Amino acid sequence: MKINFFNSTLLAGLMISAVACKQASKPAQETTTKTDSAKTIVAKVADTSNTADVFNNYIGLKNQFLRSNMKGIKSTAAMLEDKLAGIKGCTETATLAHQIATSDDIKAQREAFLILNKDIIGLIKGSKFKSAPIYVDFCPMADNGKGGYWLSVNKAIENPYFPEHMKTCGQVKEQIN
């Protein structure tokens, strides 16, 4: 019953995550909007003040998945959830991190991580966050052969989806920065 509930929640999260972090994943730019009083307001899109913290916690989480370290996965996901909650538009992505932090099933955690990666990649690509090169990696075997992405700071492939059996399965698809 718990697994079915979690899978249902995960499926709902997948649908919702398509729009999660949407505001934060767009490049910062000025937009204008008209109010009822016909005044023009200039607003900044994408508050990326916590993006570096999110990225550092994300890399920590990915590294815990490489070790299949349940305790480390839970604690790092909780820290990531906290940082995501501080970014406007990332509520659903924070919920995915919460699901990872509270689950006792590593397979379910990896499924949530698969979805979370889509939002984190969008957030990093759309932000002004700069670091050493960041690589978007891809494993064609993840997600039952549909494939899955993750971020890395190393060019060498270290697959967080199959660290025990196919640690080097995958390829670099893109370099950010």
Question: Where does each model-flagged region fall?
Answer:
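Bacterial signal peptide processing site
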Residues: 22-25
